C-alpha cells in the first residue's frame, strides 16, 4: 500500500498568511499528503476531528501553540494529545508529531500574547516539547523537532514571532521531507 499522509493541526499546518504554501505544500511535491490545518485550532478541538482517516497510512500533527496562548495548562493539553494518539492508534495510522517552535517574544508585539504571560507560555511550550518526546518514545512514534530545521535562522524567518514566512515554510517542508524519507 502506498503511503498516504494526513497533515492535521493549526495555522502552521494551514499556512497562515502564505496563501496555502505551508510546509505541507512543499511536502506535496514528493509525498501524497492532504492538508487539514486550521487557523486557531487547539488540541482540545483537534481530538474531535471526524474526517475520514481510513484512506491514510500516516498522520502528521502540529498542535499546541494555540492551547498555551489560550491559557491551557500542560496537563489539559497532554490529556488531549494522549486522546489523539489513542484515536490514531485505533485507526492503525503511523503517527508523526512535529514539535513546535518555541515562539519568540516578538509574538507579544503582534498581540498574540502579553509580555506578562510570555514567560509562562514559553515555559509551557518547553514542557510540552519534552512531553512529546516522552510520549513518542513510550508509543513508538516519530517526533520531528521543527527547532532543528536546517539551513535557516528560524527566528529571523517568523512573520510575527509564531508563524513561518515563505522561506521558513519551504525549509520546514524540506526538513520534514528528509525526516520522512528516513522512515521509508
Language-model features, listed with the residues they occupy:
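Conserved SGNH/GDSL esterase-like catalytic core that processes O-acyl groups on lipids
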Residues: 2-7, 12-87, 124
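A structural signal for the hydrophobic beta-strands that form the central parallel beta-sheet
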Residues: 7-8, 97, 143
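Short aromatic-enriched loop/helix-cap "lid" or pocket-rim segments at secondary-structure transitions
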Residues: 19-20, 48, 107-111, 154-157
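Residue-level recognition of beta-strand->loop/alpha-helix junctions
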Residues: 35-37, 99, 145-147
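Histidine-centered active-site loop/cap adjacent to the catalytic His
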Residues: 46, 157-184
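Alpha/beta-hydrolase-fold catalytic nucleophile elbow
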Residues: 62, 98-99
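A short helix->loop->beta-strand "cap" motif at the edges of active sites that frequently abuts
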Residues: 90-95, 141
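Substrate-gating cap/lid alpha-helix
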Residues: 107-146
Amino acid at each position: 500500500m502506498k503511503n498516504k499522509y494526513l497533515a492535521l493541526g493549526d495555522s502552521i499546518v494551514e499556512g497562515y498568511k502564505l496563501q496555502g504554501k505551508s510546509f505541507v505544500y512543499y511536502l506535496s511535491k514528493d509525498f501524497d499528503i492532504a492538508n487539514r490545518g486550521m487557523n486557531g485550532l487547539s488540541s482540545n478541538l483537534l481530538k474531535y476531528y471526524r474526517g475520514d482517516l481510513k484512506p491514510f497510512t500516516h498522520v502528521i500533527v502540529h498542535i499546541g501553540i494555540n492551547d498555551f496562548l489560550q491559557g491551557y495548562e500542560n496537563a489539559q493539553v497532554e490529556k488531549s494529545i494522549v486522546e489523539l494518539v489513542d484515536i490514531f492508534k485505533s485507526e492503525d495510522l503511523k503517527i508523526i508529531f512535529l514539535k513546535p517552535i518555541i515562539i519568540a517574544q516578538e509574538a507579544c508585539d503582534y498581540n498574540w500574547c502579553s509580555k506578562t504571560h510570555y514567560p509562562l507560555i514559553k515555559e509551557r511550550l518547553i514542557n510540552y516539547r519534552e512531553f512529546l518526546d516522552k510520549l513518542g518514545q513510550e508509543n513508538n512514534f516519530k517526533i520531528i523537532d521543527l527547532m532543528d530545521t536546517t539551513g535557516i535562522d528560524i527566528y529571523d524567518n517568523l512573520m510575527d514571532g509564531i508563524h513561518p514566512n515563505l522561506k521558513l515554510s519551504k525549509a520546514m517542508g524540506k526538513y520534514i521531507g528528509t525526516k520522512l524519507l528516513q522512515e521509508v
